[in-house]
């Protein structure tokens, strides 16, 4: 970009004044503005940093605002006690109108988490509302460590064991926690 110089010649503008500009007004807006979903995610990130839920943390992976990594510490008194569980959080471009996708990266023996790490919890499906936040989602996921939802399982075989032989279920869940989450 050029500006008129004192001698009638054009001189270049300082680079910082047009960083991100590629020649059209629309490209300037695309590179310098944050979408409504991005602003919402930034606000939730700030709130999460100020007041995180118990045993939970989360934040962007690198500089991608729409891809986060979360950590949940297994609550005491559960077969997951002391385990460190990592999750990927992917926010859709139309967040919060669509729920984020959460995937366990740490293997876990749980009826609401399938073998690929995908969760089967109502808050991320039928119960989703734009009023919910990532803090509420993390709290809901932590709550399934305390009280699994065996009647809406991702893995029915684990749900069946949970309902019919809780002691054996908890023994296997503890073994997995020691093996994969410590």
UniProtKB/Swiss-Prot annotation:
Tissue expression: Expressed in flower, leaf, stem and seedling. Expressed at lower level in root.
Domain of life: Eukaryota
Domain UBC core: residue ranges: 36-182
Keyword set, alphabetical order: Nucleus, Phytochrome signaling pathway, Ubl conjugation pathway
Pfam family, one: UQ_con
Gene Ontology process terms (BP): red, far-red light phototransduction; regulation of photomorphogenesis
Annotated PROSITE patterns: UBC_2
Any one Gene Ontology cellular component term annotated for this protein: nucleus
Task performed by this protein: Component of light signal transduction machinery. Involved in repression of photomorphogenesis in darkness by participating in the CDD complex, a complex probably required to regulate the activity of ubiquitin conjugating enzymes (E2s). Repression of photomorphogenesis is probably mediated by ubiquitination and subsequent degradation of photomorphogenesis-promoting factors such as HY5, HYH and LAF1. Although strongly related to ubiquitin-conjugating enzyme, it has no catalytic activity by itself due to the absence of the conserved Cys active site at position 120.
Assembly and interaction partners: Component of the CDD complex, at least composed of COP10, DET1 and DDB1A. Interacts with E3 ubiquitin ligase COP1. Interacts with E2 ubiquitin conjugating UBC5. Interacts with CSN3, CSN4 and CSN8 subunits of the COP9 complex.
Protein family according to the UniProt entry: Belongs to the ubiquitin-conjugating enzyme family.
Protein name: Constitutive photomorphogenesis protein 10
Gene name, Swiss-Prot/TrEMBL: COP10
């Amino acid at each position: 970009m050029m500006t008129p110089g004192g001698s009638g010649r054009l001189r270049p503008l300082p680079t910082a004044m047009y960083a991100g500009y590629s020649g059209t007004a629309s490209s300037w807006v695309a590179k310098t503005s944050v979408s409504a979903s991005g602003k919402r995610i930034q606000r939730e990130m700030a709130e999460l940093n100020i007041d995180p839920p118990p045993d939970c943390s989360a934040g962007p992976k690198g500089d991608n605002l729409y891809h986060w990594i979360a950590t949940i510490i297994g609550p005491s008194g559960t077969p997951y006690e002391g385990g460190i569980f990592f999750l990927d959080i992917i926010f859709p471009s139309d967040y919060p109108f669509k729920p984020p996708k959460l995937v366990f990266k740490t293997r876990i023996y749980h009826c609401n988490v399938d073998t690929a790490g995908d969760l089967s919890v109502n808050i991320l499906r039928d119960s989703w509302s734009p009023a919910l936040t990532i803090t509420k989602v993390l709290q809901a996921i932590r709550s399934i460590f305390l009280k699994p939802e065996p009647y809406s399982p991702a893995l029915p075989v684990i749900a069946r064991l949970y309902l019919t032989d809780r002691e054996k279920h908890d023994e296997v869940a503890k073994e997995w926690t020691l093996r994969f989450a410590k």
